[in-house]
Amino acid sequence: MRRTMTALAAASVLVLAGCATDEPTASPSGTASAAAGSGTGEQSKFFVQADYDNELALLDAAPTGPADKPWEQVLNPKMVDTAKFKKPGKHKICFSNAALNNPWRQVGFKTMQAEVEAQRSRISEFVHVDAEGKDQKQIADINDLLGKKCDALIVSPNTTATLTPAVEAACKAGLPVVVFDRGVNTTCPVTFINPVGGYGFGHVGAEFVSQKMKPGGKLLALRILPGVDVLETRWSAAKIALDKAKVDVVGVEFTDGDPAKTKKIVNDYIQRYGTIDGVWMDAGAVAVAAVEAFQDAGKPVPPMNGEDQLDFLKLWKDKKLTAIAPTYPTYQWRTPIIAALSILDGTQVSNPWKLPQPTITQDNLDRYLDASMPPLHYAMCGCRDLPGYPQRWK
């Protein structure tokens, strides 16, 4: 069902393609948001106090919906009418995807494809376009999809500000638009789907690490890239927790999600400071690389956070790490398909559609370990009941 499409570079996309991008620019040194030894630096321009307060409250909220289907659950639902989008028959669903450039997105997309297969009686065609992590390509992709007679458009934006005009153009074309995973700076989509969010993720990890560190200890913060709302808000919340705990943040570095670069950064800080007492990460894809850097240097692995990637969970168990795994569940990739079909049925959906965001701790770690699945698989896939499990994810 997956179809590869080539983005058009025609005159019709020139207006949007001319927008400035908030993609990170390449830097030989991986310039960070705070220079080494300068603490957490200034608060991110993405920080919104009310959103921060709301997300922290949502961490303790009880969801509505089927108890065994967290991808259908909603936290504090705010229902919106979708009657104007009701259409009979089977539907053509189009998906503009930021990228398939890391294991989290790859696992998520496999989950989405399986959800489409499970809904094949209601979906006539599923069109997927991979923007390859490029803002300008995704802008062109969305413009192209507007001419493909899609019944609904799903968007996972590469970056927040730059993709906003393209999403607004899709809304103006009359398409029901569903945004998920990463947000945009407009309220025009029918719904925005994601778990609790970046503030919740960042807070959980930073609170744990700062509490497990020795007082006044040195912490290294590892980030992936700037300009993506869910990553910026993770750092915003972590900054608040780390500042409050008076942690000595000796560096904030961007890894580009590259294990080799991560190892080099961690090793450089070990060489510079001798001891690093805590590691906070805005995503767990390179958590194993960070652990290995300490092991290679003959240093104890300090308290840290990772994510629900199985290689990290196994290492945590085997090496008895002091760790926590806030999650951004890949089961959220099922929800946009479910939402799009509900909208085309004229059924109310929540906007925003906030999904539960579980945390893996030492107490529940064993529940999420699965030796039968690949190391880069994510425990929160919510995919066990889908067609092709487990082979599709191996």
Spans of model-derived segments:
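C-terminal motif of bacterial Sec signal peptides marking the signal peptidase cleavage site
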Residues: 14-18
